[in-house]
């Protein structure tokens, strides 16, 4: 270890960092409050170790507009992080699931399926569009939305399914798997 701080700890030498890193690997896209609740570290301790893991290149962070989410470095590219960020939000996850299973749908169709107002669905769709996860195409007087890469969404959902807690979405993806 030449040219480095002799007091610096290697990235995963400390048990607490290994624990945090492993938890993020097992639950990619976890946000700070979820990590705080799951790992039961003091807030300052967790912040410190997350910063150290980022600085050492073990973790990356992604901002989804509401939360800062953490990912193992080099395991998720920016598109995968955007997909996982969406899958971590309940209504975005449900919208993505319907689009994955049913293909292109309008705001009204999604509103009916989700039991939410069209304005709420539209807001979530605009966030998905900003993240470049959906495309929209005008169909007469309505606009249909479609996943940009449904196979990638299905793959990421399938791999990380156990980290999501939404039985409705599980049933929709099970339906898709049955085709």
Predicted regions and their residues:
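Short acidic, hydrophobic short linear motifs in intrinsically disordered regions
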Residues: 28-39, 104-114
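Acidic (E/D-rich), amphipathic helical modules within compact regulatory domains
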Residues: 20, 31-75
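Short helix-capping/hinge SLiMs at alpha-helix to coil transitions
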Residues: 10-11, 24-28, 85-86, 99-102
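Long, low-complexity, charge-rich intrinsically disordered regions
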Residues: 1-13, 19-22, 41, 52, ...
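Short amphipathic alpha-helical interaction segments
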Residues: 40-52, 115-130
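Amphipathic alpha-helical dimerization/coiled-coil segments
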Residues: 78-119, 152-179
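Short alpha-helical segments that sit at the start of domains
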Residues: 1-18, 66-93
């Amino acid at each position: 270890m030449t040219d480095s701080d002799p007091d610096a700890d290697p990235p995963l030498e400390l048990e607490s960092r290994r624990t945090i890193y492993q938890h993020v690997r097992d639950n990619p896209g976890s946000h700070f409050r979820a990590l705080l609740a799951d790992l039961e570290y003091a807030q300052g301790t967790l912040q410190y170790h997350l910063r150290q893991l980022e600085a050492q290149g073990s973790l990356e962070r992604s901002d989804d507009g509401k939360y800062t989410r953490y990912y193992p470095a080099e395991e998720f590219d920016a598109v995968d992080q955007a997909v996982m960020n969406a899958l971590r939000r309940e209504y975005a996850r449900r919208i993505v699931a319907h689009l994955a299973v049913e293909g292109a749908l309008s705001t009204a169709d999604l509103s009916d399926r989700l039991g939410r107002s069209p304005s709420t669905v539209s807001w979530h769709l605009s966030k998905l569009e900003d993240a470049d996860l959906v495309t929209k195409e005008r169909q007469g007087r309505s606009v249909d939305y479609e996943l940009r890469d449904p196979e990638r969404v299905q793959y990421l959902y399938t791999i990380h399914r156990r980290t999501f807690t939404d039985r409705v979405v599980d049933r929709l993806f099970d339906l898709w798997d049955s085709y």
